[in-house]
Each structure stands twice: as structure tokens, then as C-alpha cells.
Amino acid sequence: MKEVSEKTGLNIICASGYYYEGEGAPAYFKQRAGLGDIAAEVYEMFKMEVTEGIADTGIRPGVFKLASSKNQITDYEMVFFKAAARVSRENGIPIITHTQEGTMGPEQAQLLISEGADPNRIMIGHMGGSTDLD
């Protein structure tokens, strides 16, 4: 990504985050969650990615992308939403979400805002599947 950006002069915006539990739960965090609270570890990982870069690349994300399950935000997913909201509050990184079939958008926004994320830095995605106009 860095090489392509440097060679082309294009500004490439990298995302960090996690997909919903049903398809995007990394085995490491699922196993760790079974052993105890992972909230601090997820927060520190997100914070480090934003301030120092992802892994050893030096590439910092310009946005977080998060997802929740259909009709619910699981406890596991909530850890990632809360960590991202906290890092966003501290560093200003925007958050884009993914909804399953247009469900949980308002709940995602409420959760992120309740954790201190700036509503002007949140975009709820994939709401086209929702028939609820309220």
C-alpha cells in the first residue's frame, strides 16, 4: 500500500477494525475472550495502530470500520465498538460501520456516541436493507 502510494502519488486511506462476530471474529480474540476480558488489549491495539501504524508497516489507518450482527450487537462486537469509540474520541479517527441487512444502525450510533465518539465522525453504512424509515 505504501509503495503504491509513493509510486503513484495517490493518497490511499487504509482502514482498521473488525467485521461482525459471525464471519470476522479472529481466532486469537475469540480464544482470548474465553479466558477473560479483552477490552484493554483491543483498545491498546487500536490505539497503537492509529498512533504508530499497523503491525510493523508504519501505515496508520485513516478510518475504523466496524460491523455488528443482524438484529444485535453481540458482547464480543461491543468490545470493538467501545475501543474504536474511545480511540476516535482521543485521536479523531472517523468510524464507518457495517450493518447486516440494514439492522442495528441507530443502536451502533448510540453505542459509539455513548462511548464518546463525535457524531460528526461516524457514518453508518449499508442501511439500504432497512425498511424502517424512522
Q: At which residue positions do the language-model features occur?
A:
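Aromatic/hydrophobic pocket-lining residues that form π-stacking "cages" and hydrophobic walls in ligand
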Residues: 1, 84, 108
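Detector for methionine-enriched segments
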Residues: 1, 45-48, 78, 104, ...
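Short low-complexity, flexible loop/linker segments enriched in glycine and/or proline
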Residues: 3-5, 28-29, 109-114
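Active-site gating/metal-coordination segments in enzymes
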Residues: 6-94
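Active-site core of metal-dependent hydrolases
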Residues: 90-134
